[in-house]
Amino acid sequence: MLLIDAGNTRSKFAWWDADTDKIEILGAIPHQSWLNDLSQPLKDLLLEVVSSRQLEREQQAIGCSVAAVQVMDTLNSSLAELGIKVFWQKTRAQQAGVTNGYTKEPERLGSDRWMALLGCHEQVKQNALIVDAGTALTIDWLMADGRHLGGWIVPGRQLMLNALGQGTANLKGITVNDIERDGLAAGLDTFDGITQGAEAALTGAIAQAIQLSGRYFSDQPFDVVVTGGDGEHLMRTLSVEFCRYDDLLFKGLRLCADNLNS
Amino acid sequence: MLLIDAGNTRSKFAWWDADTDKIEILGAIPHQSWLNDLSQPLKDLLLEVVSSRQLEREQQAIGCSVAAVQVMDTLNSSLAELGIKVFWQKTRAQQAGVTNGYTKEPERLGSDRWMALLGCHEQVKQNALIVDAGTALTIDWLMADGRHLGGWIVPGRQLMLNALGQGTANLKGITVNDIERDGLAAGLDTFDGITQGAEAALTGAIAQAIQLSGRYFSDQPFDVVVTGGDGEHLMRTLSVEFCRYDDLLFKGLRLCADNLNS
């Protein structure tokens, strides 16, 4: 079955083989590449990620989305063209043993964070601090018994660099792929001042969360569970022990797939 | 003499009385209030901040600016209308005992940061970690002997909240003045998740800088010198000892005033 993670800036795809119960990460498509360049319809981009052989075998897909409505409209119509019906999963108050910490308005918790919580609860039989470093850096506390204790949302690296460009007259146009170095040091020019500043803010937020975890997990052991494209880089700078799960969200979607046909 | 700090989002004014050598903070004018509302010319706003009695006594002003060119044009023409000639100060490689850490391109260091370095060197006879929490959060390392070791630039609180609004579909429109609480806690709704996330990133960056200061100051004592509107709030969350200087930048401008007539 096709698993879809429609994120803020790109959509990621994976294939769950129900026979082997294995999840294979297929690839990601940046939203800008199809929203700006209509010469290459999304349907063709999808066929570069998902093989037609897989699509013939299974016409159902399951996904979650925090993407903008324009992205969703195009994604749904392109998948329908390929004969695929998508079951979009919503955040709930309780599911698969996890209790949502947003007690007043559970549906307001991002569905990407919800799926990662479900996936983590199934994979990590331990208190977990989930660090998802993508377009935004999200941090969530999840107890071993499935209680979600809430979390944080911080602008990711590129959003931070953009924010300085917009808010000031002289600090424009730095992009993430210009950054190579791990570790923290004082910046001796504007480029390093800004890129190291973003690194300090992102790693600083994670360090604050790790410190707070003692209180939240009553000084019991916990795992730092890292996912998202920028996660590994940040943890190397922090030199903190962590376990990496690239498919945490997809593991959550796979759990939801069980209920599709039940 | 009128002292002017033309910042990213507002201009701040102070009066230096050369006889008493005292600096009186006069007030600030947000740039949007004159750029958007031409019905109230900047000249009138200035006269609400600076008394005509002061303007008659002294027709020279000294300032530094990181503001956009539209702001500077309006500011200069309005001050000229009031008969005031402004000596805008630029960042240098060396001045008043301070050596700029941007060795390759010293002029690229923000003049607001340069003035704060000059003011700090004169006021604080100690190694200093300067934390200026304004539109951007800037952090600078300054040795007791006047050597500047470089620094960081991080989006300030409102820029971080805006960044999430721009980079994601569902996290829009949170403003700084909605925030009351000190201290850090997991967010149990989207508002708290974002505002606490910004708090964690800003305090986390400062905490990372404090940690790095041991290395930069070779484990010698140092002061955490805090300035900028958001500084006190952040330091209360960090519960770290610090000394507050509201007029650090103006103290730097006052040092430059000595050379105006020499």
Swiss-Prot record, chains A, B:
The active site annotation covers D112
Q: Which residues are substrate-binding?
A: Y102, G110, S111, D112, R113, T190
Q: Name one GO cellular component term.
A: cytoplasm
Tell me the Pfam families matching this sequence. Answer: Pan_kinase
Question: Subcellular localization, per the record?
Answer: Cytoplasm
Which cofactors are required for activity? NH4(+); K(+)
* Keyword Cytoplasm attributed: yes
Classification via NCBIfam families: baf
The record's subunit annotation is: Homodimer.
The name this protein carries in UniProt is Type III pantothenate kinase
